[in-house]
Amino acid sequence: MKQTATRLTSFLFLLLVVSIGISAQRVFNHPGGILSSTDLERIKQHVDAGDEPWASCWKDLQSYSLAQNTYTAKPSAEIGGGGTRQRAASDGYAAMLNAIEWHITGNTAYADCAARILTAWGETLETASAELYQYPCRNMIMAAEMLRNSDGSFYEGWAENDRNTFLTKVRTVMYPAAKKFCTYMNSHPSWYTPAALVVMASGVLLDDAAIYQEGYDLMLNTDHWGQMYGGSIEPSGQMREMGRDNVHGGLTLGDITQACLLAWNQGDDLFAAGDNRLLKGVEYWCRYNTGHPDTPFEPLDCSGLDNSTGFSFYYISMHNNGFRLRPDACCFEAVYHHYKEVKGMDDEKEFPYLTIAARLARPDTANELLGFGTLFFTIDTKTSPYMTEEPAKPQDFRAEDGYKCIYVSWKHPENEDARGFNLYRSTDGKSFSLLKTWDYYTNNIYKDEDVEPGKTYYYKLRLINRAGGSLMSEISSATAQPGTDELPGKWNFAGISSGSYGGGMFTTAQDSTFAVSGLGKDIGGTSDMLGYVYKKVTGDATLTVRLTSTKEAFYKVGVMMRGTLDSRGQSAGLTLGETGYRMVRMFYRTSVGNSTSWINGTNYGYAPMWMRVKREGNKFSTYISRDGDTWYLIGSTTMYMPKTYYVGMASCNGQTSGETYEAIFDHVSLEAEDAAPENVPTAPRGLTAIWTDSCTASLSWQSVEDADSFIVYRSTDNVNFDSIATVSAFKLEDKVTLPGKYFYSVAIQYTRYG
């Protein structure tokens, strides 16, 4: 990391010296925010002519609640803080949209509305110090700039005293607060970039070249995590904050894009900075969010971020879903059109994923920050195509059993032609109803938790885009497994510490699933209090699980090795929980009654998450993974623990009373020296198949003692058999597509020992 930082510093120094020089005597262009007078005139001409897509997008804007000229602001003395900042940001957004409508229609009622909103805040605002004040400040400053004419004058209906009051608040409250925030070197990019943007925009609004230069330099400040490249965006395009969550990465791109637009309208090319670093960041974001979880991510040392030490971002976060097709602040259209139409770059070669995302997401409509990017930035419809053909039929559609849930998945569309889906469900395989519609979302996995344990459900899927829906998928069925409290083999449950209680449940679904309920104060300190599902082993061992619990009602959950079941005993393992339910840390207690030591992993970890704890001699190591294939070491320690010990999964709710928390771990695999069964079960016997109708075969066979599950195979030639299901019962209803002659075979799956 140090070498990379040095190279970046040298590059940026040369860039600043050679490419960036801003005159203190400059004259600003107005309106000079995200839209110039040229942009506004282009929009007006297309809207007046009824051209598409501008006319339809304009109609959408004018029907939007925040774009009404009757909008009333709700000002307060403080502009930041929970609840207040969101409403203040909406007020600023409303003022911006009304100001744009004034330019396009000439109707002063819109300008009057924008002026009323800004005047109300100018008269009321006293401080900008509470949480994330930079967001609403940015919106209001941009809105005020949009109330200007091309000669620099303001809308004449905005009374001079009212206008000056607002401008004074920008100079004395908003700008200083944003500038101060940029001195905090440990903040996230999505917090820093809007603050730097506030400084830049203040300079334009106040016609103050020195302030504008401050903001411009802050965007390129190589010492801060949040500056627009090297900090927010790596040279590869990797978005740093996507290791935190997907949404904040999009927020960062939105603010950098607005800064680039503002600078471009003043004659400065931030778009080109860092070898088109903004384009690389948007392309990276779009690659992941068009449904490509294989997007590479190099782990980052986050020491100092959030005033924390020893934490890292290991992979693109599982938080806030991901796979969203709409970055905030209308940035995908602005970036696409600038690099494609203004700079003439080849979109298919140089930013193919942005091109895919733009084509799928058009037309851009309202979102939390600005939206309407298709209306604002489309220059030529020939270079901005919409989807005109429905998606292809879903492939490899399947439903799979889960513990009290069902997983539905399908293959990512090869033609990149789907932007969402309609999922249908039935309890009889005949009468289907719509279960879920998800638009502007490219994930191809859905977890159905609104199910009755023990019940079988049938599913079918239609992919969607702007042009319509695909052909319906084949039908697939699965059962929400209720689990059993009879744990397999030598697995057991224990409440660690007196007063702790809970229990364990098991099902063969998802390659062996354990649900661990635990009431307990903590994992750590000099003694533990938790629920523990474990197995006694001897020698080296590796426990691998996928933690799937997503309900944030726990304190700490994870994997653990223990020398004894005594609450004060030696232990080593990995937990998720604590602050925000998202801290991942390794723990170890080297001797009975000693304090627990911790090794920080990440403070932005979320389920689903793969976990692993491994013992090799007296060395104990812990790992996490996003996909179960690529693993990242959290920490290792060398300590004594008896050769025979306990390994398993733990859950505690942080309380000494009340309800337990059920942590769910699937794909449980234990590799241990003594983990093999003494006697391998015999093959199932008594297999029978009876046709209950022309396309349904009812299969049954005899129970086998200690078998975990059964794999059912089917063939049409009695030679080549394909696996069709894994079940824990001794029967299966097999629905085939066509009547005919079929052959079946059943084998035992014996996974509990690993």
Whereabouts are the PLM-identified features?
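Extracellular glycan-targeting catalytic surfaces
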Residues: 24-185, 270-386
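Short S/T/G- and acidic-enriched coil/turn segments that sit immediately N-terminal to beta-strands
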Residues: 442-447, 609, 728-733
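Solvent-exposed loop/turn segments flanking beta-strands in beta-repeat/beta-sandwich domains
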Residues: 413-429, 704-721
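Active-site lining segments of carbohydrate-active enzymes
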Residues: 141-240
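Extracellular glycan-recognition regions
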Residues: 481-678
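Pro/Thr/Ser/Gly-rich low-complexity, intrinsically disordered linker/stalk tracts
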Residues: 385-418, 453, 465-484, 676-706, ...
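Short beta-strand segments within Ig-like beta-sandwich modules, predominantly Fibronectin type-III
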Residues: 436-442, 723-728
